[in-house]
Amino acid sequence: MSIASNSTVIILGSTGSIGTQGLDVISRHPERFTVTGLAAGGAHIELLAQQAAQFHVSEVAVFDETKVPALQAALAQAGAQGVRVTGGPDSVIAMAGSGANVVLNGITGSIGLEPSIAALKAGSQLALANKESVVAGGHLLFSAQVRENQINPVDSEHSAIWQSLRSGTHAEVAKLVVTASGGPFRGWKRADMENITPEQALHHPTWNMGPVVTINSSTLMNKGLEVIEASRLFNVPPERIDVTVHPQSIVHSMVEFVDGATICQASPPDMRLPIALGLSAPDRMTNVAAACDWTQAATWTFEPLDDEAFPAVQLARHCLAASEKHTAVLNAANEQAVHAFLEHRLPYLGIVDTVKAVLDQMDAELRGNPLFTDVEEMNQLELEARRRADDLINKQ
């Protein structure tokens, strides 16, 4: 779908990494976009109020309902007038489903699924950076579409694949190749990782992201989730999706075609590029991000993934082959384990070990009916996965 020349936009997760960069892109093209609503968790109330004032939005929603009074005060302080303020998860879902031309979903975690579904059902084009929507509830998400091609992927890897797929038909695709920077511990062996601290893991060599995504990038669980997302978004089986380590993070992913040609998308690492395309596709905008400087000598390297040191990708592949419920448990248990690690309650190697243990516990009960019937069923399964992860973490 071609986005209207002056599109209404709602930003979910506006104070996070995706949201702030999305607003930066929009600020450079005021003639193309009008931001009508912002939603955020509630951890950065002053920033949310400043965004509302800068973009003259009509509505702001906050997940944490207790932050509504503080947000109202911050809006007054920022000089934002006539802004409707709502609170609680239902208010964010309602905003997402209000019928904007584009909804940019930069929420972290599976709580982003219901807003994604609401946006699709309302006919909005969904610029999707919330990979958990696809990982935990892909069937529910895709069945909510009211037309074809309603989802614009915003993850840099999936945006790269999306762009590269324009070079051929689906039948001509031999494989997808997802690139990984390797994270801060590239080249480390498993034995070297026992004493990794949150502070070390939060230092990513390439990308500036939120804490959960940064930890996922260090364990390469993020890459595992991206393999799941790529398979479901582009209808390619997992055995035809490779992962290669590319430390320079210039080639963001590739598509290999049946004739031997490989098409890639290359650019210096800057999330504003895939965000901008997610907002404006199929059109491209000027003044978004820097291009590669082809006048300078450069070396791009690619190396195989060390599955022994980073078992998360293989674990994700196993879940993808098993069922949607397995991938939902993978995601929920991982979120719980990452939070425990960030709070110094779980050692670094315990993150993926905990996820695997939860999956082992729940495997038999997940195999009966592989698809969720509704979001409530998914939420209940995730709660059980989180509970089991907590039990294992508390025994550490």
Swiss-Prot record:
Domain of life, source organism: Bacteria
Binding site for 1-deoxy-D-xylulose 5-phosphate: K131, S156, E157, S181, H204, S217, N222, K223, E226
Binding site for Mn(2+): D155, E157, E226
GO biological process: isopentenyl diphosphate biosynthetic process, methylerythritol 4-phosphate pathway involved in terpenoid biosynthetic process
Residues reported to bind NADPH: T15, G16, S17, I18, G41, N130, E132, G210
Keyword Oxidoreductase found: yes
Keywords on record: Isoprene biosynthesis, Manganese, Metal-binding, NADP, Oxidoreductase
EC number: 1.1.1.267
Pfam families: DXP_redisom_C, DXP_reductoisom, DXPR_C
First-tier enzyme category under EC: oxidoreductase
Function in brief: Catalyzes the NADPH-dependent rearrangement and reduction of 1-deoxy-D-xylulose-5-phosphate (DXP) to 2-C-methyl-D-erythritol 4-phosphate (MEP).
Membership in a protein family: Belongs to the DXR family.
Name of the protein described by the UniProt record: 1-deoxy-D-xylulose 5-phosphate reductoisomerase
Natural source organism: Bifidobacterium longum (strain NCC 2705)
